């Protein structure tokens, strides 16, 4: 056989073997617990580590899931690896619904980003939702104790911002918008575009690239050390989620559909393995929050958490090479009167040796 051809075949075998044959580790789930409930609707979680402390954020609203000016973002901190949590900040934006908060550690500063629907002085009727009035905001802290006032994110008007990531001295956001900011109904669904937004300081943003020109929705980014990008995107049409890959300079994108929908997607690396999380729909049990190993282009489920109804949007933080925490929200429990509550939950993951 030609030596050059043999080298190509060997290289292809190694790539395929590493992508598809490596078995992910076994995981045990323990210490499942409710960590926050204040009588309000609590949802959309994220976790991070900053200056030796753990941080948990989520939206809280006395009026429920939909678009209300009464919503706010809560930030909790733990100094004991998640055993106990203390509120360190809570913020809102006048006449806007703050939701989907996400962390980013960037330039030695902790940011919390939120996409905000314009609501006005009262609850906004669903028929009046307008993606073109969306605007991103952030609060930030240099020490996790003292926080800025909410800062409007330049370049995000008309964009529904979502998860953030950083690589190579730049910050990146998923932003979705209507093509040409067209005037019309709400703007969610098959026509919506997903963009990679880029920033030098975490506050002023510009378009870097489109990665979904149709069916754009919530998308999570994961950068490899060499700049390669892996992303998991919710399908704006409610169908199977997207597995998206690119590499610098992010001008070409490989997009393929997974075998299931994923609501509120998460993608993180734990050691040498990639975890995907979010909401799934089951037959007979409704929606559930689950975690998967990504093996090649396939998902292998390893955990389904106690959850139901309005739920998902997990966060993840590694505690050690064999231990991690997962946060999520759910409405599967009830209060003393038998009414459903929507609360924040946490679980510990341990890799089996």
Predicted regions and their residues:
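Short, basic, low-complexity termini and linkers enriched in Ser/Thr/Gly/Pro
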Residues: 2, 8-20
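Beta-rich carbohydrate-recognition and catalytic domains
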Residues: 22-40, 49-96, 104-309, 319-353
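Hydrophobic, well-ordered secondary-structure elements that form the walls
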Residues: 316
């Amino acid at each position: 056989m030609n030596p050059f051809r043999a080298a190509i075949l060997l290289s292809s075998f190694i790539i395929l073997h590493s992508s598809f044959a490596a078995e992910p580790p076994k995981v045990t789930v323990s210490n499942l617990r409710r960590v926050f409930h204040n009588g309000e609707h609590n949802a959309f979680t994220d976790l991070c580590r900053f200056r030796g402390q753990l941080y948990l954020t989520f939206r809280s609203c006395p009026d429920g899931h939909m678009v209300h000016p009464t919503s706010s973002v809560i930030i909790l901190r733990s100094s004991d690896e998640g055993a106990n949590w203390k509120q360190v900040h809570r913020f809102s934006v006048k006449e806007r619904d703050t939701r989907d908060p996400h962390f980013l550690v960037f330039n030695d500063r902790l940011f919390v980003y939120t996409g905000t629907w314009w609501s006005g002085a009262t609850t906004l009727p669903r028929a009046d939702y307008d993606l073109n009035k969306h605007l991103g905001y952030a609060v930030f802290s240099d020490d996790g104790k003292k926080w800025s006032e909410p800062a409007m994110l330049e370049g995000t008007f008309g964009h529904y911002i979502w998860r953030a990531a950083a690589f190579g001295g730049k910050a990146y956001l998923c932003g979705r918008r209507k093509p040409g900011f067209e005037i019309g109904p709400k703007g969610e669904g098959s026509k919506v575009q997903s963009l990679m937004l880029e920033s030098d300081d975490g506050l002023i943003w510009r378009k870097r690239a489109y990665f979904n020109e149709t069916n754009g929705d919530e998308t999570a980014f994961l950068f490899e050390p060499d700049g390669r990008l892996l992303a998991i995107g919710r399908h704006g049409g409610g169908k199977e989620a997207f597995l998206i890959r690119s590499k610098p300079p992010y001008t070409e994108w490989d997009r393929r559909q997974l075998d299931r929908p994923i609501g509120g997607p998460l993608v993180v690396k734990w050691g040498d393995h990639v975890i995907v999380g979010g909401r799934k729909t089951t037959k007979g049990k409704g929606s559930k929050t689950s975690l998967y190993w990504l093996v090649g282009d396939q998902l292998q489920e390893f955990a389904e958490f106690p959850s139901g109804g309005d739920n998902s949007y997990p966060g993840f933080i590694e505690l050690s090479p064999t231990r991690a925490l997962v946060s999520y929200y759910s409405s599967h429990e009830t209060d003393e009167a038998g009414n459903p509550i929507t609360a924040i939950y946490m679980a510990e993951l341990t890799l089996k040796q």
